[in-house]
Structure formats: C-alpha cells, structure tokens
C-alpha cells in the first residue's frame, strides 16, 4: 500500500478505504474554515490539545486499540498505522453496541473498567498533534499520562464513539453528548504551568499546578521520550471526567490523598516507582510488596516545592513522590531516598532542620525520620508493627538507640526504630572466638579483620599474584639507592589482597630495616606496620616464613640487646606463630605438625628451643625495672628499646619496665603455644614444667615471681609448675593427682622453697604460699571447665556440645574436710610465727577457704562460716 501524502486529495480517499473495511462514516479534516499553519515539512498541524471555545467538544482517547511500536511516531501514512492496528485510525462514528462494556460510576461520570484494567500508568507522556497523515508527539502537560508498552498508545488514538464529526456544523449539537461519554480527558492547556518533565503527578488526574509562571517545557518532537520501567503489577487509578479543559481544577477532598507537587523525579534510564495515586486497595498491596534499597534517587533539581498541595485530613499517610513515609505502611532505609534541605519545603514546628550530616551511608545503622505534615500523619489503626515488614533490616546501635529514646516525639516525624535480630550480628564475636580455642590471639593492628567482612570473603576466591614487575622495579630502585623509607612506603601501597611481595623483599625488610641499628624510630614503625599488613593479607606458613630460630636467638641474646627494633621483631615472630597455628587449626585440624609452631616449639622435636624461651623469660622477669640491672641498661625515649649505657643507671626506669613487660608477655604466649602444638597437652605441660622448675627457684624477689605467674597464659602449665613446687616442698610426697584433695594436702604439709626478701618478715613467706595455693585452685577450675587436658583438635567439639568435665579423683571433698584443714592450717601458722595472724594473712586464708568451697560446689551453712571466721 503506497504511503498517503498530506494533501487534501489524499485525505478524500479516506472514506473509500473505510468503505472497503465495511464502515460508512468518515471524518473529513479538509473542511476546516479556520486557517492552519504549516510546519517545516509543509504539513498542516491540527493541535487538539488547544481549546478554541466552550462549543468545541473534548475528544477522548480510545485505548482499546492495538498498540504500535515507538518507532512509528515519525511522519508516516495513516495506512501504515491502520495496518498495524487492524482498523482505521480516524473514524467518524463507531458502533459500540456490539462490544460488551463494563462501566462504573466514578465522580458521577461513566468510566469503562477495561481502560482501567488494561493500561498501567507509569508517568507523563507527550500529548499528540494530528497532521494530515501523521501523529506527532507534543510537549508534556501537567495532566498527561504515559502508558505501558513503550508509548505504543500513540497509534491507538480514536475519537469518541459519540462524536460523529469534527466539522463546525456539528460542534454545537455534539458537545453535550461527547462531554458526558468521554473516557479520558486530553491534556489541559498549558497556561501558567511550571512542571518539570521528570516530576509529574498521577496520570489522567488533573491536579493544581504550582502558582508560578514559567515557559512551557520543550516539545516532545525535539526531546525523545524517556525510557521508563514499571513493576508488572497494575496500579489502578480513578479517571475523573471533565466537561471542558480546566483552567485550574482542585483535587477532590476524599480519603485518597493526592501527591503533592514536590514528588520524586526519576532521571532517565533509571527504573523507578509508578508515579500514580495510591488508593486504599493499593496501600494494602504495597505493605507486603518488597522493595530494594537504593532504587529511588532524588535530586534537588527534580523537585518542585509546592506548599499549596492539598493534604488529606487522615486515613492515609502523606505520599511525597509516591514514596510512602510511614512506619506502618512503607518504611524505608536512608539508602532509598537521599533528602537534601532543598527537596522538602520547611514547615515550622513540623520538621526538624536537616543538614548535610543527615545524609548517611546506607550501610550505617541509623534511625529514619520521615517528614510529613500533621494532617498526613497515619492513624493508629493504620500503623503496622515494624517487625512484620520482612525487608527492613536496619540495625540500631546502643548509642543511636539512646539518642532516639531521649528525643521527644515530634508530631511531624515518625522515627523508624528496628529491633536487633536475635542471634545475628551480636553473636558473631562469640562464634569467632570459638575458632580460637585458646585465648584470643596477639591482635593485629588491623584488628577489625578478626571478623572477616564481605569483601574479605569475596577476595578469597581471587587468584593471588606477585607484585607486578614494573612496580617491583620501583621497590628495587629504592633498595639500591639505600632509601629504606621509600622502600617501605612503596610496598605499603603495592601490597594488596591480590598481590604479595617476593620472599627476598620480606627478608630484606626484616633483616636490613627492622633489625638495623641505624634506622630512625619512624622507619622502624613503618617497617613493622608493613610486616603486619603482609601478615594480615598473606599469612606466612612453614614454607614461606622469613625468619628462623637462629635469627631469633641472635636478637634475644646479648648480641641483640642494643638493637632498637628488638621488641618489634619479637612481636612479629609471635604473630606469625599465632596466625599460622590458628589457620592450620581451622583448615587442617589434623595437620598441626606442619605448622611453624610445631617446627620450632615442639617439646618432642625441639625441646632446647623451649628451654631457650624459658631462659629469655626469666631473664626478662628479673630485669623488669623493679631492681636495677648491674650493667645499667636503659631505653631510648622514642622506641622503648634497650640500649647499653654505663652512665645514668637510674634514668627512665618506667620505659625499661614497660619494655621488659612486653617481652615477658610475648614469651609467655610462645610457651602457651608450645603446650598445645603436640597431641597431648598434659605431657607437654609436664615437660615444660620440669624445665621451668629450676629457673623459678632462681627468681630472687617475690614481686618478680608474682609477675612470672600472673602473666602465664596457659592455666594447665601454671598448675603443673605450682604442683611441682609444692611437691618438692612437702616432707612426705603424696600420690594424689592434681585435684582439690591434693590442694588440701599441700595446705598443711608444704613449706616455702622460695627465697624470702627478709628473715624478719617471715609471715610474708606464708602469705606467698597461700597466694600460690589460690593460683593453683583458680587455674585448676579453668583446666576442668575448658577441657585443657584434651587435645586442641578435640576441644572444639567438647566446647560446642557443652560436655561437662568428668569428675576427677580427689575432687569429692566435703564441707567438713575444708573446715578441718583450714583450722589446722591456722593453728600451724600461729605456732610457726609465734604471734597472731596479721590482717593481710587472715584475709588470704579466708579467701582460700571460699575458693575451696566454690571449687567443690559446696554450700556451707552460716554456722560453720561464722565459726571458722571467729576461730581466726
């Protein structure tokens, strides 16, 4: 079929085509008495969106025709449109009697329900202007609508069935009938209309435009239509009919609130929410509809404030831009809509002042304050409990919760508060600690990675690669130029979860920078931080570790006493031991023999290394600054590292004490690892305790021995050491195993083997003996409840299953036994000292009695309690 031209002769052929299709009436658009202007292509344009008078009828849109693709908006023949739609596009009178229609009365106007059900309204479409043979989209209007199907309704334009002709002779006679039977109003004329194309109200419903005059938006012929998407669900909307194009039609005050003029504007190519009025039947549907956060962006340029927007007196929440701000209907997180002070008009007394600090990251837990006017606040009946909303997962921190509770309730804002999910984030640290069956590890400086986040879990699947050659060349250049600070800084930037440094580079950092005697404090700290980062991202194992026991011995012996990075290196060594032990324990529980700790600290393989650690520990304890060493060691002010000096022996004793305390803690951690690396912790602890016994007897002062026992991390090892000391101090050794009965036996049969500071204060010797018995009872409780006698491989299952410890031989003591032994010990002390007990010693004896009671789960009556205390 040849395309028709725009001339009048071709349009006269239109009745012939209608007759071929079996239809008799036609519309003759050539009988227009009013002069028409031509556009650039020489075609006559008839703009049906403009009203010439009250006698002109309002043409309606028949949406029942088959849609066409958006590509057919261009000036083509009407025959092309007719071929796609299956019937004539323009016709004078259509007999609708043969078509069954479902009607209902809305606002005293009949409306076809098939129009409401078959079309989903998304946003503002361009209106249409009909030329001789073409359909042109024109500029959008304040009451225009966009239909689903990519603007395919443009080919479905049809005059109303009650309008037989648009000629001047029939205008007056047909005006009343056409106005009463119209399906949908055409866009209202643009008079003093200020509407951005992106922020339009509900389709097919006239709303008051802002009282602000501005030029009309550009024509749709020059601006391509926006690509909008909408959900598959159909949102129903009422279609009030108009008898004539309104100049200013107010919204009817119903229970259905109309959206204000500051509705959300959606940018192009961004899927958004359907910009339509929410009716009561739709609100119930939206309450159960999940929404993904972050899908409704809002910018200040897309919002046109209008304080004159009508508000609903109640019954439904206020809907700014079709986003429901109500904790009962549709709460949403701060990541959904980003408000700025310019987006929302300020109402005094109703809204808090918003600043830039109110824009929060969506990952942060926070409260949501939805701004709404008092007239639009939800009724108590419409509020829904927040826990019923399945998609809301806003976490609330305790600090934020206190703030929200302390703030008074404002009438214009609704605070969205959520409950912390049970068994959620707060249980993760507990579960994480279960992975470490000993005490918590020596913490990284990057301690937040103890609980791996989402990025860390995702990075585990990526392939590891060495640092690229070009970047590595920059590092080697700084090494050749002897610029250690540049080397460290380059590596700090280049090391990442995907890229690891070569082994020789790590060895250079340890030996040439960290253990260098000429580097500054800042360079040493940077080198240590770099090693910690490498250890965090790429933990060393038995094959990749870059230190050995020979290097550690050199640093801890006399030769390394003057190295300023001595303590930092020891911390790095302990960190590598701890990380590798825990990694092996979590991933390959049966392969602890392949860990670094098993290679260097096993009592079966390397007992001399364990003896070295004990020797370094006792040396650090005896030189902890409480007594000045004879060689007068002191520390540098910046690093806390020992330096040899023959003058000023009493300078900076606190720094010396702190340095040695750090060394003591690190060495005690190494011993606790040595207890666990072998299959039987009991055998390992017995061997280490035998090695340690002679060194403990050589500790000269009580304060140093107290430091030695209180810093010991392994409770099993402390029990074994104290047991050996008490066994050697008894005149008649006992065959009882480590138990409560054995502790009672030590109470009345042991004497102190440890050196006393002065012979004049003999009661202090007994005071220390009672203190050691307290240490023994306390550690014994840890051994029983934490299953420390079992292998670390089996300990996890015992803890998770909450298996109670097995009763030990000698733990079945009674209240009478405890009372009898305590009274005998008091009598013995008075006899040995020749004087009444001092208050300090009395308190410790009473505390020992309570520990025995609670250790045996005994509940003594009040009489023996008072009797025992009075006897003291």
Curated annotation (Swiss-Prot):
Q: Where is this motif: SUMO interaction motif 1 (SIM)?
A: 26-30
Annotated spans, Interaction with SLF2: 381-872
State the superkingdom: Eukaryota
Q: Which GO terms describe its molecular function?
A: peptidase inhibitor activity; SUMO polymer binding
- Compartmental location: Nucleus, PML body
GO CC field: cytoplasm; PML body; sarcomere
Entry-linked InterPro entries: ElonginBC-PRC2_ViralRestrict (IPR052119)
Per UniProt, the keywords (alphabetical) are: Cytoplasm, Nucleus, Protease inhibitor
From the UniProt entry, list the residue stretches annotated as the region Required for inhibition of CAPN3 protease activity: 459-872
Motif range (SUMO interaction motif 2 (SIM)): 45-49
Comp. bias (Low complexity) = 163-181, 292-313, 369-384
User: Per the record, where are the segments of Basic and acidic residues compositional bias?
Assistant: 339-353
Q: Where is this region: Disordered?
A: 163-199, 246-387, 625-655
Q: Where is this region: Interaction with CTBP1?
A: 1-367
Which residue ranges are recorded for the region named NSE5-like domain?
A: 467-802
Q: Where is the composition biased (Polar residues)?
A: 628-655
- Oligomeric and partner information: Forms a heterodimer with SLF2. Interacts with SMC6 and ZNF451.
Q: Tell me, what does this protein do in biology?
A: Plays a role in SMC5-SMC6 complex recruitment for viral restriction. Forms a complex with SLF2 and this complex is required to recruit SMC5-SMC6 complex to PML nuclear bodies and sites of viral replication.
Can you say what this protein is called? SUMO-interacting motif-containing protein 1
Q: In the record, what lineage is assigned to the organism producing the protein? A: Eukaryota, Metazoa, Chordata, Craniata, Vertebrata
């Amino acid at each position: 079929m040849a395309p028709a031209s725009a001339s009048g002769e071709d349009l006269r052929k239109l009745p012939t085509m209608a007759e071929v299709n079996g239809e008799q009436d036609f519309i003759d658009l050539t009988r227009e008495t009013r002069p028409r202007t031509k556009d650039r292509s020489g075609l006559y344009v008839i703009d049906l969106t403009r009203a010439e008078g009250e006698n002109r009828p309002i043409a309606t849109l028949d949406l029942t025709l088959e849609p066409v693709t958006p590509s057919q908006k261009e000036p083509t023949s009407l025959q092309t449109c007719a071929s796609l739609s299956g019937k004539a596009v323009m016709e004078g009178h259509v007999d609708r009697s043969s078509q069954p229609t479902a009607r209902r009365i809305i606002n005293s106007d009949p409306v076809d329900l098939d129009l409401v059900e078959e079309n989903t309204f998304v946003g503002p479409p361009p209106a249409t202007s009909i030329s001789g043979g073409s359909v042109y989209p024109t500029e959008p209007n304040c009451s225009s609508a966009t239909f689903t199907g990519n603007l395919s309704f443009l080919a479905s334009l049809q005059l109303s069935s009650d309008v037989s002709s648009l000629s001047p002779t029939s205008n007056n006679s047909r005006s009343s009938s056409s106005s009463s039977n119209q399906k949908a109003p055409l866009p209202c004329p643009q008079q003093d209309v200020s509407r951005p194309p992106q922020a339009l109200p509900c389709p097919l419903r006239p709303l008051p435009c802002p009282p602000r005059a501005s030029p009309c938006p550009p024509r749709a012929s020059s601006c391509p239509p926006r690509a909008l998407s909408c959900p598959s669900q159909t949102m129903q909307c009422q279609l009030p009919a108009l008898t004539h194009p309104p100049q200013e039609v107010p919204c009817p005050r119903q229970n259905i609130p109309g959206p204000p003029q500051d509705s959300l504007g959606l940018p192009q190519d961004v899927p958004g929410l359907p910009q339509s009025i929410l009716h009561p039947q739709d609100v119930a549907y939206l309450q159960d509809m999940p929404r993904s956060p972050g899908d409704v962006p809002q910018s200040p340029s897309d919002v046109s404030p209008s304080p004159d927007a009508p508000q609903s007196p109640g019954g439904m929440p206020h809907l700014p831009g079709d986003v429901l701000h109500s904790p009962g209907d549709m709460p949403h997180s701060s990541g959904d809509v980003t408000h700025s002070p310019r987006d929302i008009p300020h109402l005094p007394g109703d809204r808090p002042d918003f600043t830039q600090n109110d824009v929060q990251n969506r990952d942060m837990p926070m409260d949501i304050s939805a701004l709404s006017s008092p007239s639009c606040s939800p009724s108590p009946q419409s509020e829904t409990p927040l826990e019923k909303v399945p998609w809301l997962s806003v976490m609330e921190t305790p600090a934020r919760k206190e703030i929200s509770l302390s703030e008074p309730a404002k009438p214009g804002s609704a605070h969205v508060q959520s409950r912390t999910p049970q068994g959620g984030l707060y249980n993760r640290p507990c579960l994480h600690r279960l992975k470490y069956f000993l005490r918590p590890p020596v913490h990284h400086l990057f301690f937040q990675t103890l609980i791996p986040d989402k990025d860390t879990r995702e990075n585990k699947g990526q392939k590891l690669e060495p640092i690229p050659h070009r970047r590595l060349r920059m590092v080697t250049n700084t090494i050749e130029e002897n610029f250690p600070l540049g080397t460290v800084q380059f590596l700090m930037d280049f090391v990442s979860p995907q890229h690891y440094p070569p082994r020789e580079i790590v060895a250079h950092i340890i030996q040439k920078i960290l253990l260098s005697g000429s580097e500054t404090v800042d360079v040493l700290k940077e080198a240590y931080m770099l090693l910690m980062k490498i250890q965090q991202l790429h933990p060393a194992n038995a094959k990749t570790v870059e230190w050995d026991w020979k290097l550690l011995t050199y640093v801890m012996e006399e030769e390394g006493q003057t190295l300023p990075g001595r303590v930092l290196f020891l911390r790095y060594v302990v960190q590598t031991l701890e990380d590798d032990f825990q990694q092996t324990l979590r991933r390959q529980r049966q392969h602890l023999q392949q860990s670094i700790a098993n290679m260097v600290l096993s009592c079966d393989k390397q007992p001399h290394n364990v003896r070295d650690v004990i020797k370094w520990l006792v040396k650090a304890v005896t030189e902890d600054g409480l007594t000045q060493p004879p060689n007068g060691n002191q520390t540098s002010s910046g690093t806390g590292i020992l330096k040899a000096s023959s003058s000023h022996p009493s300078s900076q004793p606190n720094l010396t004490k702190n340095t040695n305390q750090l060394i003591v803690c690190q060495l005690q951690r190494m011993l606790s690892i040595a207890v666990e690396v072998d299959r039987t912790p009991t055998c390992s602890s017995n061997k280490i305790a035998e090695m340690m016994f002679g060194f403990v007897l050589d500790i000269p002062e009580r304060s140093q021995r107290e430091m030695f026992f209180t810093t010991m991390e392994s409770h099993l090892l402390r029990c074994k050491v104290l047991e050996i000391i008490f066994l050697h101090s008894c005149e008649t050794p006992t065959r009882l195993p480590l138990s409560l009965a054995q502790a009672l036996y030590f109470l009345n049969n042991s004497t102190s083997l440890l050196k006393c500071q002065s012979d004049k204060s003999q009661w202090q010797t007994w005071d220390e003996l009672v203190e050691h018995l307290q240490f023994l009872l306390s550690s014994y409780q840890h051994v029983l409840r934490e299953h420390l006698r079992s292998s670390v491989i089996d300990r996890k299952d015992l803890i998770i299953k909450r298996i109670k410890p097995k009763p030990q031989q000698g733990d079945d003591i009674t209240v009478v036994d405890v009372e009898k032994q305590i009274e005998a010990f008091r009598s013995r002390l008075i006899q040995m000292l020749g004087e009444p007990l001092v208050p300090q010693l009395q308190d410790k004896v009473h505390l020992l009695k309570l520990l025995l009671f609670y250790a045996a789960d005994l509940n003594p009556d009040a009489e023996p309690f008072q009797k025992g205390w009075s006897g003291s």
